[in-house]
Regions:
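Conserved PLP-anchoring active-site segment centered on the Schiff-base-forming lysine
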Residues: 1-14
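Short, intrinsically disordered, charge-balanced linker/junction segments flanking boundaries
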Residues: 3, 186-192
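Hydrophobic alpha-helical segments in the ANL/AMP-binding
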Residues: 15-22
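Helix C-cap/helix->beta junction micro-motif
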Residues: 23, 83-84, 114
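Short beta-strand->loop structural element characteristic of the AMP-binding/adenylate-forming
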Residues: 26-33
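Active-site phosphate-binding strand-loop segment of PLP-dependent enzymes
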Residues: 37-99
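Conserved core segment of the aminotransferase class I/II
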Residues: 112-182
Length: 192
């Protein structure tokens, strides 16, 4: 709703922030530390603002900082959202592309209360610019998100959706991700 508050990381992905603003939402920004969103600042924002609708976070390789939220902070984020009755929008376009270190469980994997909306993208793992994404959320939320998306661009290109469907139907996704990680690992090693 117009005037509702979305809590986001500072800095954050400008594309998402502009989308939220286009619906008349107010943004309350929380600093990003080395291990993710500042949880003390987040709780302060949640205490002081009663019309927060959701918390937007990019916990893996946060855009633009590149930082990854620690497991402890992910647990705290989930508990704060539960305590204050707000949703979490976990945007994870880069999570499958970790080339070193241990994977950190998603916030969605902790969700026993149906408060985490999980978003992923095929643009980072299949083809840049394909612009096909997905969400995992309760049906009423998916229905509202569908209406919002239709207002932005009518729908994702049908041809691109068909390409993704065919690719997912005929490809070993995990093997493909392994190859992509190897390519990125080699490029990272060359640059470092």
């Amino acid at each position: 709703n117009f005037g509702d508050i979305i809590v986001c990381e500072n800095p954050s992905f400008i594309g998402s922030l502009n989308c939220f603003r286009s619906y008349g939402c107010k943004l309350k920004c929380v600093p990003v530390e080395e291990d993710g969103m500042d949880m003390n600042a987040l709780e302060k924002v949640l205490k002081e603002n009663k019309n927060v609708r959701f918390i937007y976070t990019i916990p893996n390789f946060q855009n633009p900082s590149g930082r990854t939220m620690s497991l402890e902070k992910r647990k705290t984020l989930y508990e704060l959202a539960k305590k204050y009755g707000v949703l979490i929008l976990e945007d994870n376009p880069y999570g499958d592309l970790r080339v070193s270190g241990e994977n950190v469980p998603t916030v969605k994997s902790m969700d026993e209360d149906g408060i985490v909306i999980y978003a992923g993208s095929f643009s980072k793992v299949l083809a840049p610019g394909i612009r096909v994404a997905y969400v995992i959320a309760p049906e009423p939320i998916v229905a509202k998100m569908t209406v919002c998306k239709q207002g932005q661009d009518v729908h994702t290109a049908m041809f691109n959706q068909m390409l993704v469907y065919e690719w997912m139907s005929t490809t070993d996704f995990e093997a493909h991700i392994g190859k992509i990680r190897d390519i990125y690992r080699r490029k990272m090693t060359l640059m470092c």
